[in-house]
Every structure is written in structure tokens, then in C-alpha cells.
């Protein structure tokens, strides 16, 4: 499936979903070209950004890290700065969500296709890892309570999970396997906290667009009429480690 950016792809996917299709989607990729000498070319875009002055540094840092070239920077009225970048299209994949977070919803980002240019080299999209279910079963409050210390959860108690499914976002860069089906062992000794209710942070429920932005190159988004699930391409943990 090909389209003009993540928004166009999400519309196509949502239409297929409503028609009853069940399928898996990998991370969006750009279409490369090659010149007459066999040199790899990639699509480039011009990005025009209006952002409050205090957030301009974060935006510049993020886009230069995504192979963007700052071509213009000028002050605007009301304490805003206008930035102009030339950036590979793949550098914008998954960025809009980060942009909204970094600017606290106060930034404006518009892009237009420029041309095909020389390939800019490898790029790392995500700086956080995934929390991966270790075994199949039903998510238990106790297991989720221990897991939420690692990062942001995507599921709530009672949801069915299987080995290899992504149940949350790790606060650190690496992936971690966790057991969200873990139950508390019963003992004859009553602990002082036995009667305390375990409180869970409200899980993050991602939209289709957010899920498409989130998935990494080794992950898939499972799309069904009822659910959106993120999983590893290789479900078995042993095989996944060998492949890595």
C-alpha cells in the first residue's frame, strides 16, 4: 500500500478496517529512486515551522537529528520563531506526535515535497524501547502494577495478551520482556500492605495515526475491526534475540 504520507496511509487503512479486513502493517517506508549511475536517491521535503521561541531549540535538535538541514530562521510577532528545514521524507515519519509534545501543542508544521536528493544515511527513529509480553494469557492487575514502573502501559487488566505483543513503552532505550499475567503468590503470612489496593496509571490508548508513528522497524501494527495491537515481527523471544 502506498500513499502520500502517514495521514493518507491512515485513511486507507481505516477504510479497509471498516470493510472488515484484518491485516498487519509495518513501519512506513519511503520509495527510493536510483540515478543513471546507480546512486541511491530519497525524497526530500521542505518543512515550514512556526513555534514559540522557547521551543525552537528542541525542534531544531530533533530535526537535525533526523538529517534535517536548517535553511532559515527568523523572528516573528508575539514571541514566535519561523524555521525552514530541508529534510528527508523518512525523517518526518513519526515526528508529528513528538512535535506536538515538544511544543505543547503550540507549534505549526507544514511540509511540501521538494525533490529527490542523495541518500542521507541511516536514521534512528525512536529513543525509547518497548515493553513486551513474555507469555500468553490475561493481563492481571498485580502484573501490570509491577510493569508500570518501567514506563507507559498500553493495556488494562483483563485484556488478552500473547507472547511478543507490545503492552507498553519503556522509559529507556532497550526493549524489556515483562510478565503482565503474573499473579501474587499467596502466603500464610499477611503483609502490612496486603489490604492496600494496587493502583494503576491509566493506560495510553493510541489512535491509528499514533500507532503508525510509534511502531519501530522490527514491529507490526495488527489492524482488525475491533482492535489495534502492536507486536514484534518475531514473536518468539529466543528467535527474536538470535535475529537481533
Go through each PLM region and give its residues.
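Accessory interaction regions appended to the cores of large information-processing enzymes
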Residues: 1-244
Amino acid at each position: 500500500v502506498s500513499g502520500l504520507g502517514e495521514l493518507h496511509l491512515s485513511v486507507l487503512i481505516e477504510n479497509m478496517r471498516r470493510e472488515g479486513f484484518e491485516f498487519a502493517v509495518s513501519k512506513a517506508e519511503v520509495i527510493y529512486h536510483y540515478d543513471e549511475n546507480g546512486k541511491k536517491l530519497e525524497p526530500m521535503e521542505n518543512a515550514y515551522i512556526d513555534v514559540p521561541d522557547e521551543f525552537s531549540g528542541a525542534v531544531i535538535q530533533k530535526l537535525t537529528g533526523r538529517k534535517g538541514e536548517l535553511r532559515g530562521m527568523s523572528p516573528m510577532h508575539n514571541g514566535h520563531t519561523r524555521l525552514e528545514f530541508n529534510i528527508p521524507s523518512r525523517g518526518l515519519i513519526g515526528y508529528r506526535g513528538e512535535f506536538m509534545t515538544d511544543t505543547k501543542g503550540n507549534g505549526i508544521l507544514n511540509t511540501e515535497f521538494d525533490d529527490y536528493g542523495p541518500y542521507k544515511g541511516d536514521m534512528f527513529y525512536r529513543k525509547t524501547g518497548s515493553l513486551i509480553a513474555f507469555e500468553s494469557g490475561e493481563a492481571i492487575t498485580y502484573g501490570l502494577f509491577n510493569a508500570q514502573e518501567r514506563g507507559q502501559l498500553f493495556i488494562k487488566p483483563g485484556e488478552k495478551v500473547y507472547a511478543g505483543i507490545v503492552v507498553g513503552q519503556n522509559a529507556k532505550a532497550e526493549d524489556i520482556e515483562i510478565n503482565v499475567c503474573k499473579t501474587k503468590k499467596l502466603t500464610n503470612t499477611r503483609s502490612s500492605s496486603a489490604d492496600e489496593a494496587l493502583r494503576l496509571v491509566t493506560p495510553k490508548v493510541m489512535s491509528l495515526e499514533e500507532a503508525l508513528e510509534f511502531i519501530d522497524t522490527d514491529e507490526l501494527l495488527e489492524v482488525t475491526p475491533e482492535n489495534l495491537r502492536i507486536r514484534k515481527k518475531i514473536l518468539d523471544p529466543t528467535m527474536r534475540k538470535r535475529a537481533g
